[in-house]
């Protein structure tokens, strides 16, 4: 039964039929279910034979899996990347976007611009991933932007206060600043944040990116986070900055954009936009798969 329960969890995970917050609770049972199945398998070893291929796989492979399950049960996953900190400033960027600055007691290690980290605010035990919009030179001051899109983000907007404790785990992610080459960067909504991180890093290093265009998509100028800052950063980094506002120019024609684009595209934003771009692009498309199941 343990095997079938574990298999059911895998199917539910792949199909994403359960809301993430509920799935997260169920997912915590996976190590327990795995250990139950492995112990049951060990009870059958005398019949199977320890030195048979199945027996050795169960003993060695299953044992390694059991070690991982125990490691997870004791909360050791990501512990070396965990940092303590406090909320130092809260700055509303618009009606739905809150910029949060966090000061850590010890620096992040291995950070690359564009990566994200998990933030657990006010000891709620609910770590959520947010892009690191900016990281100070000593990697002790982190900036993130939170858009009020769900229950957790609405709670942060309403209840988070300066001085609240934060646990930060990370950084993670492969959507890091690429090597210099002509490219199109497209950020939609709050998906603009990794590009802010890239540009902040370029300006800090004194680097430029000629031949690169940044396209920011937003409903209105008021709902376009960091657009003024981006214009200045792009000017200093030699990047062509374009702001597409739906209120003025209508919805961006992603199909046409994809068909005429011949340089690599780096995209961060809503999944439907990514799928449309991917369907019409002949050039490579790079994006962070910001899903965890």
Per-range role (PLM):
Residues 77-167, 183, 210-213, 217-220, ...:
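Ferredoxin-reductase
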Residues 1-78, 148-293:
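FNR/FR-type flavoprotein reductase catalytic core
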């Amino acid at each position: 039964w343990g095997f079938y329960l574990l298999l059911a969890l895998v199917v539910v995970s792949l199909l994403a039929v359960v809301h993430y917050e509920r799935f997260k609770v169920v997912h915590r049972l996976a190590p327990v279910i795995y250990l139950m199945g492995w112990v049951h398998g060990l009870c059958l070893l005398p019949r199977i034979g320890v030195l048979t291929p199945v027996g050795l796989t169960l003993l060695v492979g299953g044992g390694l899996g059991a070690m991982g399950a125990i490691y997870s049960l004791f909360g050791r996953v990501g512990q070396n990347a965990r940092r303590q900190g406090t909320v130092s400033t809260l700055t509303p960027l618009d009606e739905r976007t809150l910029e949060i600055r966090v000061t850590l007691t010890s620096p992040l290690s291995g950070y690359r611009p564009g990566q994200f980290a998990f933030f657990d605010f006010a000891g709620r035990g609910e770590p959520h991933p947010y892009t690191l919009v900016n990281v100070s030179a000593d990697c002790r001051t982190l900036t993130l932007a939170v858009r009020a899109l769900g229950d957790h983000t609405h709670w942060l907007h309403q209840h988070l206060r300066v001085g609240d404790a934060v646990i930060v785990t990370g950084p993670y992610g492969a959507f890091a600043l690429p090597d210099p080459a002509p490219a199109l960067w497209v950020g939609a909504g709050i998906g603009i944040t990794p590009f802010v991180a890239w540009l902040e890093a370029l300006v800090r290093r004194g680097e430029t990116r000629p031949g690169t265009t940044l396209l920011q998509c937003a409903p209105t100028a008021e709902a376009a986070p960091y657009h003024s800052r981006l214009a200045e950063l792009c000017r200093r980094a030699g990047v062509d900055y374009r702001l597409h506002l739906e209120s003025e120019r209508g919805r961006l024609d992603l199909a046409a954009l994809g068909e005429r684009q011949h340089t690599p595209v780096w995209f961060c934003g809503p999944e439907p936009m990514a799928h449309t771009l991917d369907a019409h692009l002949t050039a490579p498309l790079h994006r962070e798969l910001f899903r965890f199941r």
